[in-house]
Amino acid sequence: MTRYSQPDALGQYGIYGGRYIPETLMQAVLELEQAYAEVKEDPAFRERMNDLLENYVGRQTPLYYAEHLTRTIGGAKIYLKREDLNHTGAHKINNTIGQALLAERMGKRKIVAETGAGQHGVATATVCALLDLECVIFMGEEDIRRQELNVFRMELLGAKVVSVTQGSRTLKDAVNEALRYWVKHVDDTHYLMGSVLGPHPFPEIVRDFQAVIGQETRTQILEKEGKLPEAIVACVGGGSNAIGMFHPFIDDEEVALYGIEAAGSGLETEKHAATMSKGEVGVLHGSMMYLLQDEHGQVTEAHSISAGLDYPGVGPEHSLLKDIGRVQYEAVTDQQALDALQLLCQKEGIIPALESAHAVAHAKELARGMQPEEVVVICLSGRGDKDVMTVRNALKGEA
C-alpha cells in the first residue's frame, strides 16, 4: 500500500491548498516555508518545544475511559482524549507554542492572529506573554459579544484586541482583517494562523504541531486496549484538532475517521456551517478548499451556536480526505450539540466546549450501533467554561 503523504512539493493536497496570495505576501510565505523546513531538522528546536509542551502546557493529556457515558449509551467503549486539560483549556496552544517559537527564530517580534471562539486568541496571547512578543488579535464584533470573557483574558495577557465590524463580523472577517494587517507589517510580523487554513505552508505547519494529539492517542489506546480504536470522532470548523487527531491514523484503514461539522439550525436551512455537506470548491484566504457559496460564487455566512465552528470553509487536507473517502464528514445541529453537552456534564462531570459537544453528539449515535468490545475515541478539543453563558441562554430559550 502507498503510504499517505501530503502535501506535494507545491503545497497542494490533490487540487486543494496552494498559495492564492498577493505578491506582497509571497516573500514572507516563502521565508516561513524555509524556516519551517530548517526547524523540522533541528533537534534543539524540537527539544525546546517538547519541554514547553510538557512543563508549560501540561502534556501528555489523558485518554480517559468514559465508563458512565459508555454504560448510559450502550454499545462501544467510549474514550475521551482530554485536550480540554491543556493550559488555556483547548488544543489551540499545541500550535501557538510551535509557531511562536518559529517566529522568534525568524527574528519576528510581533504576532498577529485571528480568533473566533477566542480560544486561539487566548492561546496566542498566552505564548506571546511567555516569549515577550507583541500581540495583536483580530476578532469579529459578533464573536466579541459571544465571548466577552475571552476578550478580557486576551487583554489581561497583554494583547491588543481589534474588533472587526465588516461582513458577518465573525471568524471569516477576522481572518480578512488580520491578513490585511500582515500585508502592511510583513517585515517584522508573523501571522500565527489558528487552523489548517491559509496558503501553504500554514495547513502543514498547523497539522504537524497538532499531530501530537493523534500520536499520544495511538500510544495510549494501544496501552489501554491492546489495539487501535474502531472509530475516532472529532469536530471540524477549520479542522485543526481533527487533522491533528486523524493524521497519525490515516494509513490505518481499519480505523474509521469521522469529522463532525455544525449543522446549526439544520442542513435544510441557510443557518449552518456544514461545508462538506453543502459546500462547493472555491478559494478563500489563500487556499483552495470546500466553501459555502451562493450561486454567484460569493462566500456565504456560516452559522453555529459554537463560535469556533462557524467558518464557511474547511482545511484543504480535509477537502482531499473527503474526496478520497478516508474521512466521513457528518453534521450535528445546535440542539444535538446542546443535548450531548448536558449528557457529558451529567454522566462524567465534564463540561465540554460547544465545538467538542458536536463530536460527542455524533459519537453517541455511532457507539450505540457498535459492539461492547469495540472502541470509539472522541477528541474532546476544549473545555466549556467559555460557553456557559451561551448554553444557559440557549437552554432558557428552550424552557
Swiss-Prot record:
Matches recorded under InterPro entries: Trp_synth_b_CS, Trp_synth_beta, Trp_synth_beta/beta-like, TrpB-like_PALP, TrpB-like_PALP_sf
Pfam families from the UniProt entry: PALP
The protein's required cofactors: pyridoxal 5'-phosphate
Entry's EC annotation: 4.2.1.20
GO CC entries: cytoplasm
SUPFAM superfamilies, A to Z: Tryptophan synthase beta subunit-like PLP-dependent enzymes (SSF53686)
Membrane-spanning parts: none
Pathway note: Amino-acid biosynthesis; L-tryptophan biosynthesis; L-tryptophan from chorismate: step 5/5
Top enzyme class: lyase
CDD domains reported for this sequence: Trp-synth_B
Reactions listed under catalytic activity: (1S,2R)-1-C-(indol-3-yl)glycerol 3-phosphate + L-serine = D-glyceraldehyde 3-phosphate + L-tryptophan + H2O
Sites of N6-(pyridoxal phosphate)lysine modification: K92
Molecular function terms, GO-annotated: tryptophan synthase activity
Keyword Protease found: no
Function of the protein: The beta subunit is responsible for the synthesis of L-tryptophan from indole and L-serine.
Similarity comment: family membership: Belongs to the TrpB family.
Quaternary data: Tetramer of two alpha and two beta chains.
Protein name per Swiss-Prot or TrEMBL: Tryptophan synthase beta chain
Lineage, uppermost ranks: Bacteria, Bacillati, Bacillota, Bacilli, Bacillales
